[in-house]
Amino acid sequence: MTMMKRIFLLFAAVVMAAGVASAQDINKAIEAANNGNEAFQMGEYGLAIDAFKNSLAIAESLGEQGVEHANTCKTAICNIYLAFSKNLIKAADLDAALAKLSETISVSEGYGNAETAESAKELIPQVYMQKGNTALKAKDMAGAIEAYNKVIELDPNNGDALLRLGQAYAASGQFESAVASYETAAANGKELAAKKQLSTLFLKKAQASLKAGNNQEVIENALKANSYLENANAYKLAASAAQKLKNNAQCIEFYEKYLELKPNAKDAAGVTFTIAALYQQDGNKAKAIENYEKVAADPQYGPGAQEQLAVLKK
C-alpha cells in the first residue's frame, strides 16, 4: 500500500470518529487533518506534519472522546516523517536524510509506533552506505572510511561495506587496515572479491619492495599475494627477486609457475631460456636441454639455445 493511500485511509478513520465528540472541535480536527493530507500529497511534508500535529492537539483536548482520532494522527505523523526521510534519500540529501530519520525514530518511539521506528532504523545503514559510495567515487577516502565504518557499526556483517572500506583504506595507504577489512569481508560473503583485492594489494607491495631493492620482501609479498589468488605476475616478480638473490632453485620454481599460468606470455621464450640457463648452472643437464629445445626455433633466443644445445649434447 502506498503512503498516500495509507494517509487517506487514516483520514477516513478521522472522519468516522467525528460523531463521538463535539461537532465544533471535531470539525476543526478534521479540517486540520484534511489540510495535512493535502499537504502530504503535494510533497509539503513539513506542512503536513504541522497540520496533523495541530489535529492531534485538538483530539487530545477532547479527552476520552478524541483517543481514536489522536491515535490516527500519531500514525499519520510517523508515516509522514518516514516518507519525508525517504524523499531526502531519493534526492541524495543524505545528511538531511539522516537527521530526519533520527527525528522519525524519536517521534515514532514517543508515539509507541515501533514498526515505523524500526523501518527508519533499517534505512540508516543504507544511507551511510550511499554516503560512502559517493565519497569513494569522488576519491574522498577520509569521508568514505568514516561512512563505511558507520555502516559496519550498525551492521557488522555487511560484506559490501567491509569490502569497500578495504578499498578506501588501500587507496589512502592504510595497508594493515585494508587487509583487516578485506579479510573480514571474505568471512562475510565476499570471499572471491576480497581475495582478489588482497592479492592485488600484496602484489603492489611486492612491486614497491622490488623498487626499493628489498628482494626477500619481494618474494614474501608475492607469495602472500598468491596465497589469496594465484597471479602470474606475482610469480614473475618473485622469480626476478630470487635471481638477484642467486637462489636458482627458487627462481626456476617461480618462473615455471609463471609460465604455467601464462604460457602465451610475450616474454615466454626469454623466460624459458633463463630457466634453461639456470638449470645448466646447477648442473641439471637434462632439464637444461629440455628447456633450450623449447626455444631452439625462436628468432631471438634460438641461436643462443642451439649453441648451448651443441655444447650440452657433446
What are these regions (language model features)?
Residues 16, 20-86, 90-91, 99, ...:
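N-terminal leader/linker segments that initiate helical-solenoid repeat arrays
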Residues 41, 79, 83, 87-90, ...:
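Register position in tetratricopeptide repeats
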Residues 55, 104, 150-151, 184-185, ...:
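Canonical positions in the second alpha-helix
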Residues 60, 109, 156, 189-190, ...:
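Short coil turns that delineate tetratricopeptide repeat
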Residues 65-66, 113-114, 120, 161, ...:
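TPR alpha-solenoid repeat register
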Residues 68-69, 73-76, 83, 123, ...:
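Canonical tetratricopeptide repeat
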Residues 197, 204-216, 220, 266-269, ...:
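Terminal, low-structured helical/coil segments at or just beyond the last alpha-helical repeat
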